[in-house]
């Protein structure tokens, strides 16, 4: 049986109003637009980097 790819379940919990443009871009790249919106993101180096940039704004759970 093939190994399942790991994904992250990411939820935006805080607003990006007072954030830098770089942080706003990272949230948008993760696919988040509204507070309390949840998305699944495939595990990659780019995704991990964006998650680290905005870790104070989001909740992250590992799935798979």
Swiss-Prot record:
The keyword Ribosomal protein applies. It holds the Pfam family Ribosomal_L30. One of its GO terms (biological process) is translation. It comes from the Bacteria. GO terms for cellular component: cytosolic large ribosomal subunit. CDD domains: Ribosomal_L30. SUPFAM superfamilies: Ribosomal protein L30p/L7e. The keyword GTP-binding does not apply. One of its GO terms (molecular function) is structural constituent of ribosome. InterPro entries: Ribo_uL30_ferredoxin-like_sf, Ribosomal_uL30_bac-type, Ribosomal_uL30_CS, Ribosomal_uL30_ferredoxin-like. NCBIfam families: rpmD_bact (TIGR01308). Belongs to the universal ribosomal protein uL30 family. Part of the 50S ribosomal subunit. This is Large ribosomal subunit protein uL30. It comes from Bdellovibrio bacteriovorus (strain ATCC 15356 / DSM 50701 / NCIMB 9529 / HD100). The lineage of its organism: Bacteria, Pseudomonadati, Bdellovibrionota, Bdellovibrionia, Bdellovibrionales. The gene is rpmD.
């Amino acid at each position: 049986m093939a190994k399942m790819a790991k994904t992250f379940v990411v939820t935006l919990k805080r607003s990006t109003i007072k954030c830098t443009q770089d942080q706003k871009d990272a949230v948008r790249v993760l696919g988040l637009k509204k507070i309390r919106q949840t998305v699944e993101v495939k595990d990659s180096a780019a995704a991990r980097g964006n998650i680290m940039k905005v870790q104070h704004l989001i909740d992250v759970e590992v799935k798979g």
